[in-house]
């Protein structure tokens, strides 16, 4: 098991809860083997010569007695909720949260950066019906995500679950620029999808959680990725604004440790890396 990643920024504690690290083919992230091999700093943390690292993880934010889980395992629904696997993954995740000191019953808010998957926002009960996985939490999404979903919900496996939870009054929304907790601010970026939002921590900001703007740290070197983003130029422009200023970057889908600093055309592992 990888060492736990924890950051302290002012009165906020951020803790990464890792479910699994995996190696996957580059085309899953819109990359090629040539792209992977072009990144000099890929090994050993982020990629091999032929595959890149990814994770299923969740970030826990603790501030002033409140507990928020940010984008819990927001990918790979076809694996996490495969009917053939039953409740194996949800049961294992619930046990993991308990073991890591964050029982699901203690979470106040499930903060989702954009509507795309179910992840561990919800689970099927014994009757096969979808219910919130965090029983005492409100689900919070960017207002732009809610507006975009109401306008064009699409026809994806997650669509019906989101429709059910929204209609049941389980979902709240926040505006662009909203302060989630003192020292944590939302920024609507779009680019990946209409409501995609990143979150900044501290006054610098000292850290930025990127959501799916960079599915892998390799995307910080490989440039435009139209396979991942309907607005690749916009995504790349936003990412460029997060380099060379000393901030820590956090990626929810990145392999352990899931954080680093972008400086001088390289991505330096961890929060303590020199810049």
Please report, for each region that a protein language model flagged, where it lies by residue.
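Residue-level marker for the onset of beta-strands and adjacent loop->beta junctions
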Residues: 1-3, 55-57, 128, 176, ...
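Metallo-beta-lactamase
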Residues: 1-102, 106-118, 124, 133-188, 206-213, 238, ...
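Short, P/G- and charge-enriched loop/turn segments at secondary-structure junctions
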Residues: 44-49, 127-128, 186-187
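Metal-dependent catalytic neighborhoods of phosphoester/phosphodiester hydrolases
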Residues: 120-130, 260-262
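Short, basic/aromatic-enriched C-terminal tail that caps enzymatic domains
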Residues: 257-275
């Amino acid at each position: 098991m990888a060492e736990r990643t924890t950051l302290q920024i002012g009165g906020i504690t951020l803790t990464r809860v890792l479910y699994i690290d995996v190696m996957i083919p580059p085309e899953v992230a819109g990359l090629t083997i040539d792209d992977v091999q072009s990144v000099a700093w890929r090994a050993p943390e982020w990629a091999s010569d032929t595959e890149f690292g990814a994770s299923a993880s969740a970030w826990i934010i603790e501030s002033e007695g409140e507990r928020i889980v940010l984008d819990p395992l927001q990918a790979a629904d076809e694996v996490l909720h495969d009917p053939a696997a039953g409740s194996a993954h949800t049961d294992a995740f619930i046990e993991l949260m308990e073991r890591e000191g964050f029982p699901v019953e203690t979470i106040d808010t499930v903060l989702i950066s954009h509507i795309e998957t179910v992840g561990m926002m919800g689970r099927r009960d014994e009757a096969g019906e979808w219910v919130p996985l965090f029983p005492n939490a409100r689900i919070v999404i960017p207002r732009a995500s809610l507006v975009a979903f109401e306008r064009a919900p699409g026809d994806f496996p997650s669509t019906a679950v989101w429709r059910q939870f929204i209609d049941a009054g389980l979902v709240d929304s926040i505006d662009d620029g909203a302060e989630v907790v003192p020292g944590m601010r939302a920024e609507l970026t779009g680019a990946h999808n209409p409501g995609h939002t990143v979150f900044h921590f501290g006054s610098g900001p000292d850290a930025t959680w990127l959501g799916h703007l960079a599915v892998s740290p390799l995307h910080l070197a490989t440039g435009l990725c139209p396979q991942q983003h309907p607005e690749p130029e916009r995504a790349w422009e936003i990412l460029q604004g997060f380099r060379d200023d000393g901030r820590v970057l956090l990626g929810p889908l990145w392999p352990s440790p899931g954080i680093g600093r972008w400086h001088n055309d390289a991505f330096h592992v961890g929060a303590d890396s020199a810049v």
